């Protein structure tokens, strides 16, 4: 699991100090609260409280997860990489990678043993804010001989 940051913000600083993080699924329902966590606030401000979210203890890492998030992954940091330009020069931006050590998923999002992405109404930022919805999904069969993930009943 990983996330990127355009600068050395609280998230990157915190994971570099603790070696742990929790990835919480941002959804359409939580968009405003999640957006509030990006405000530039002093270190002593509780961003959970600022955003109106509930912090709950994790089981395998010492950082909390967001109770209201319908899916979350507890992670141990494996690598923090500073971005480089095409010349190999370091630029402002970071990629944090971690091994997932625990997963929480709202069971209503699982059908026939498979996580139903669109049911969670996840959002992402890819130049702009985007939402994954059921009407934008499509079916695609894997080609003969292509590898299938072992966790998907390959």
What are these regions (language model features)?
Residues 1-154:
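Basic, polyanion-binding surface patches
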